[in-house]
């Protein structure tokens, strides 16, 4: 399948705060060795692009898969605009799947997507979490709600700072409207979603005013971890709560070489699979059908059509560690 060739653009966007821009300009002139600034309230408008959609596409990402077959067909709720945005302007799409015996007193998971947007792998992960932990599961969208399908360019206003604000919005809703216990609420994401996990738990004062009261821990699968201190690639770590990271040695989408050692070593635990590509847990037949082990495909990303090879063994090892991580925090 040929990749969708639309180049992402940012129109009508307010710039990040001067605190970001001035330090980054000096760094570019060689007057500073790094470029960093704290996220502030002045940055919220830039990282809250308008919500423009109230329904999800039936066949997302250039009609490459069926949303119905990966939600309703497998017993997951349809995507609905139920999460009030961080800035209070509109609602994010999400699939909310409370446990039939009640929400409180059991684990809850927020599942967040990568740069291709929600895909069958995210819904397969949601099913596994629901069944393995008898959990409540919220599958959160950040792109469809804003009239787009992907963020392949990565370092844009649709990147990690926007995503963290969406996580805060989802955590608020989960606690205040759904009745979940934040002491047992977990964030899990892959690729750019994994990046979002790392950024969410980074000791950034603006975010940490809220997140400790919303989430217990985070799980990052093959995360993007480029960090140069700019608004688009802000710092990652140290972390304000428990974080579990998984990486792959054959990952050419989010290669481990881009990760500062401190980003990985600051985690509660970091597991590396030397033979794994990006997306080793890919649901290559959809969430409704068992995956084909060993099959390799290519990403639709126009900037990097990296290989994605399913590995049942790596997926099983990862899930075993996730299970012990969650249980260890749920039953101290």
Task: Indicate residue ranges for each PLM-predicted region.
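Primarily recognizes the serine-hydrolase "nucleophile elbow" in alpha/beta-hydrolase
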Residues: 168-238
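Serine-hydrolase catalytic machinery in alpha/beta-hydrolase-like enzymes
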Residues: 83-100, 105-179, 284-307
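Bacterial signal peptide processing site
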Residues: 36-38
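C-terminal catalytic histidine-bearing segment of alpha/beta-hydrolase fold enzymes
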Residues: 268-332
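N-terminal cap/lid segment of alpha/beta-hydrolase-fold proteins
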Residues: 47-102
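Bacterial N-terminal signal peptides
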Residues: 22-33
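Short beta-strand/loop motif that positions the catalytic acidic residue
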Residues: 239, 245-247
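Conserved alpha/beta-hydrolase "acid-adjacent" motif
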Residues: 252-258
């Amino acid at each position: 399948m040929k990749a969708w060739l639309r180049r992402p653009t940012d129109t009508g966007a307010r710039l990040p705060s001067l605190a970001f821009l001035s330090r980054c300009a000096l760094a570019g002139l060689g007057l500073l060795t790094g470029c960093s600034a704290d996220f502030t309230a002045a940055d919220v408008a830039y990282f809250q692009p308008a919500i423009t959609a109230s329904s999800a596409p039936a066949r997302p990402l250039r009609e490459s898969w069926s949303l119905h077959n990966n939600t309703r067909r497998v017993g997951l709720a349809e995507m609905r605009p139920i999460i009030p945005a961080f800035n209070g302007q509109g609602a994010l799409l999400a699939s909310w799947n409370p446990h039939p015996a009640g929400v409180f007193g059991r684990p809850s998971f927020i599942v967040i997507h990568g740069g291709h947007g929600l895909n069958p792998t995210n819904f397969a992960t949601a099913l596994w979490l629901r069944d393995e932990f008898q959990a409540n599961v919220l599958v959160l969208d950040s792109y469809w709600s804003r009239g787009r399908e992907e963020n392949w360019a990565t370092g844009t206003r649709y990147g990690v700072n926007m995503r963290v604000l969406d996580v805060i919005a989802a955590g608020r809703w989960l606690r205040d409207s759904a009745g979940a216990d934040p002491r047992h609420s977990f964030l899990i994401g892959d690729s750019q979603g994994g990046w979002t996990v790392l950024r969410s738990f980074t000791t950034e004062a603006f975010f940490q005013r809220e997140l400790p009261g919303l989430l217990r821990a985070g799980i990052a699968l093959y995360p993007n971890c480029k960090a140069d201190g700019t608004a688009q690639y802000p710092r990652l770590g140290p972390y304000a709560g428990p974080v579990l990271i998984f990486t792959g040695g054959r990952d050419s989408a989010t290669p481990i070489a881009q990760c500062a050692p401190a980003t990985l070593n600051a985690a509660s635990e970091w597991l590396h699979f030397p033979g794994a590509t990006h997306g080793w847990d890919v649901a290559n037949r959809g969430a409704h059908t068992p995956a084909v082990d060993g099959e390799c495909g290519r990403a639709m990303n126009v900037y990097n059509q990296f290989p994605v090879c399913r590995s049942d063994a790596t997926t099983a090892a990862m899930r075993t560690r996730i299970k012990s991580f969650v249980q260890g925090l749920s039953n101290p």
